[in-house]
A protein has these predicted regions:
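Short loop/turn motifs enriched for small/polar and acidic residues
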Residues: 1-3, 33-35, 95-97
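Glycine-rich phosphate-binding P-loop
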Residues: 1-17
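A broad structural signal for alpha-helix termini and local helix breaks/kinks
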Residues: 19-20, 85
C-alpha cells in the first residue's frame, strides 16, 4: 500500500472516522494520549504519541490497559515499548521510498497474536495511490 505525505497525517483521523468516534482526532503530542469515546456501543479510540516516552513502564503509567478491551489503541512511535501491551497487535510500519525526491510512503502491515493469526493482510498490499479496496472493485 502506498500513501502520500498528506495521507499519512490523516491516518489516525481516518481510523477515528471509521470507528465513528466522538469529536475530532488531533495529535496527542503534548498530552501523550487522547481518548475518543465510541458512539452507539462502537469501540472508542485511544491515540498515543510514545515518542517522548523512555520505557515500557512509562507507557504502562498511562493506564491504557483500562481501555484495551473496548477501544482501538493507536500508538505512534511505539516500537520497542508497546509490543507487550496487549495480547494481539497490528504493526503499521510507514517508510519513505528510497528516492529523496519521492514523497510517497510505503505502508507495511504485520499482525501479531491470536487476533491476527488467521487474517490475510495481503489484499491490502497493492492498491493504486489514493484509492481504497472498494474503489478498485475488491471488497475485503
Amino acid at each position: 500500500m502506498r500513501c502520500r505525505r498528506a495521507e499519512l497525517a490523516t491516518l489516525a483521523q481516518g481510523i477515528g472516522l471509521g470507528l465513528g468516534v466522538e469529536g475530532p482526532v488531533i495529535s496527542p503530542t503534548f498530552v501523550l494520549a487522547r481518548r475518543h469515546a465510541g458512539v452507539d456501543g462502537r469501540p472508542g479510540l485511544v491515540h498515543v504519541d510514545a515518542y517522548r516516552l523512555g520505557s515500557a513502564a512509562e507507557l504502562v503509567d498511562l493506564d491504557l490497559d483500562e481501555t484495551m478491551d473496548r477501544a482501538v489503541t493507536l500508538i505512534e512511535w511505539g516500537a520497542g515499548i508497546a509490543e507487550d501491551l496487549g495480547g494481539s497487535h497490528l504493526d503499521i510500519d510507514i517508510r519513505r521510498s528510497g528516492d529523496p525526491a519521492d514523497e510517497t510512503r510505503v505502508v507495511y502491515l504485520e499482525g501479531f497474536g491470536p487476533r491476527w493469526q488467521d487474517v490475510d493482510l495481503s489484499p491490502l498490499s497493492e492498491f493504486p495511490l489514493g484509492t481504497t479496496p472498494d474503489e478498485t472493485g475488491d471488497n475485503i
